[in-house]
A protein has these predicted regions:
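Extended, charge-biased low-complexity segments
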Residues: 2-47, 54
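Amphipathic protein-protein interaction modules
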Residues: 39-100
Length: 100
């Protein structure tokens, strides 16, 4: 099981560390979503909804860690170069907004 990041960070930092995160966790981020958005990784409550720490910080559901990993791994496999962390974050944001 990977890590959960209950401390506030940025969406860029979370995407950079995605491989180390608990795949059962969820990413929450402040809108509008950018690489610099405040974000954290937490377990979704069993009853659903937002974890208390995300509500207090004004964060919204962004994407589940497992879905983010699967999407980025598939996207990267089709590229002819290694994307930068910023490119990965930008692409994941587009996916979360338009396809997830």
């Amino acid at each position: 099981m990977g890590a959960v990041r209950p401390m506030m960070t940025t969406l860029n930092n979370i995407v950079t560390d995605l491989a180390a995160l608990d795949e059962a966790a969820t990413i929450y981020a402040a809108e509008p979503w950018t690489g610099d958005s405040k974000a954290l990784v937490a377990q979704e409550p069993l009853a659903g909804g937002l974890p208390p720490e995300t509500k207090a910080a004004g964060l919204k559901y962004f994407i589940e860690v497992a879905i983010a990993r699967d999407f980025l791994n598939g996207w990267i496999a089709g590229l002819d170069h290694a994307p930068s962390p910023q490119e990965m974050c930008d692409r994941l944001i587009r996916y979360a907004v338009t396809d997830a």
